[in-house]
């Protein structure tokens, strides 16, 4: 008799416990990456070129220029994570502009997350919370 009572009580707890669901609420709203940004730092160093990145949220495309060549590709985002796909690029050689172009494309290959605060975009490394690039959103 004791076994039947204990089994019944255990069964009641299991039924009640399995019937409840938990909600996960995100503390921060999802920010859609969109617009044109002027790059101001790469790996913590100020740059003097007019490098720009443009994110199109409708078709998830990225476009950019660091003073000479255009590059383009696709991106996906989920909350604060960011993954940039394979980039295509024009192949002109421009004296002085190539250093920033290579640096920006390397950053875009290694980005894992982003943050937008007060119109400033920061791209972070995929392996650590290290800022790789900062940019200011252009007025539209």
Where do the protein language model's features map onto the residues?
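Bacterial Sec-dependent N-terminal signal peptides
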Residues: 1-29
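Lipid interaction determinants
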Residues: 18-140
């Amino acid at each position: 008799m004791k076994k039947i009572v204990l089994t019944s009580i255990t069964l009641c707890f299991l039924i009640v416990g399995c019937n409840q669901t938990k909600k996960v609420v995100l503390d921060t709203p999802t920010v859609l990456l969109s617009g044109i940004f002027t790059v101001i730092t790469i790996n913590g160093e100020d740059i003097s070129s007019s490098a720009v990145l443009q994110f199109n949220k409708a078709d998830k495309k990225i476009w950019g220029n660091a003073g000479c060549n255009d590059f383009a590709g696709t991106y996906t985002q989920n909350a604060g994570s960011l993954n940039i796909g394979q980039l295509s690029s024009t192949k002109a050689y421009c004296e002085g502009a190539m250093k920033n172009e290579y640096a920006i494309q390397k950053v875009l290959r290694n980005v894992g997350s982003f943050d937008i605060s007060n119109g400033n975009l920061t791209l972070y490394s995929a392996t650590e919370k290290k800022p790789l690039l900062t940019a200011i959103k252009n007025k539209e």
